A protein has these predicted regions:
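Rossmann-fold dinucleotide-binding core
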Residues: 4-85
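Helical "substrate-binding/catalytic lid" subdomain
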Residues: 76-178
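Short, basic/aromatic-enriched C-terminal tail that caps enzymatic domains
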Residues: 177-192
């Protein structure tokens, strides 16, 4: 099951499949499918994960066994998304507000001084592009992430806010255009 959903959702599906005599494997796709296609990194978990990894490897795919319990592969993907998609949402909120306030260059300079190892304009343009192109799907995933975090007994504020930002940028319908940060910010702001 390669759906991007909460571990508890996968566990419920596994119970149904097992009751019918099937073998369920939790599969998480860990990077964009394009351009790697079938060579995209995969995590598999559950009691049949090793058997699935053997079959997937024979198909020239890139599986890695994440554990013997259904939900482990999905938990890794979901919790990684708190960070990856959350950084995208922080980028959008920070730089859209900075652009609207007329202080975008100063904010980027401050970020660059704090973290000189990151090319902030390029990374920010990339993060916005990912949200504009994939925001609707990522928002749905982030709602599953929020359910994962809640099931762990923790507040889901960051994940829920990330889902809202992903939805918001997707709903603008703005085309990413060239990888020019200022122009990309302007295209989004014009539609908010």
């Amino acid at each position: 099951d390669g759906n991007s959903c909460a571990p508890q959702t996968k566990q419920a599906a596994a119970a149904v499949i097992a009751a019918a005599g099937g073998r369920y494997v939790d599969l998480a796709v860990m990077a964009p499918v394009h351009p790697l296609r079938h060579r995209v990194p995969l995590l598999v978990s559950g009691p049949h994960a090793q058997a699935a990894a053997t079959v997937l490897t024979a198909l020239d795919m890139q599986p890695r066994v994440a554990g013997a319990e259904v939900g482990q592969a999905s938990a890794i993907k979901m919790l990684r998304s708190v960070m990856i998609k959350g950084i995208e949402a922080l980028t959008a909120e920070c730089l859209l507000a900075a652009r609207r306030a007329g202080v975008e260059a100063q904010v980027i300079a401050s970020l660059q001084a704090s973290d000189p190892g990151t090319d902030w304009p390029a990374r920010s343009a990339y993060n916005l592009e990912r949200m504009l192109v994939h925001g609707a799907r990522r928002a749905a995933e982030m709602r599953e992430v929020a359910a994962t975090v809640t099931a762990l007994g923790l507040p889901d504020g960051m994940s829920a806010a990330t889902a809202r930002w992903q939805d918001l940028l997707a709903a603008t319908g703005a085309e990413p255009g060239p990888a020019d940060l200022a122009a990309r910010l302007d295209r989004v702001l014009a539609r908010l």
